[in-house]
């Protein structure tokens, strides 16, 4: 893939990419990035892990998600911008 390639022109570089959203609380989300608005980050087909503060639980959740795909619990989810600590591509979490 070309660096800086935008999946859909006029959208963010992450548009359509499966991402991991780490929050300032105990939640972790994995879903397809759509956009960020004043309301927050909009994801589609979202898996959610509560109590993600436990590193072993988080790593296991991400390992299984990477291996078997996103088990969507939400069709759409908006994570408020103030609760977003970091957004990264799911492929960056591949340890295998």
Where are the predicted features?
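Conserved RNA-binding domains used in RNP assembly and mRNA/RNA metabolism
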Residues: 2-96
């Amino acid at each position: 893939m070309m660096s800086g390639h935008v999946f859909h022109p006029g959208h963010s570089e992450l548009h359509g990419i499966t991402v991991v959203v780490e929050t300032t609380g105990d939640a972790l989300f994995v879903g397809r990035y759509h956009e960020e608005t004043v309301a927050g980050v909009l994801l589609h087909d979202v898996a959610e892990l509560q109590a993600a503060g436990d590193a072993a639980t988080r790593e296991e959740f991400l390992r299984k998600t990477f291996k078997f795909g996103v088990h969507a619990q939400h069709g759409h989810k908006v994570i408020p911008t103030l609760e977003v600590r970091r957004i990264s591509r799911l492929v960056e979490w591949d340890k295998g």
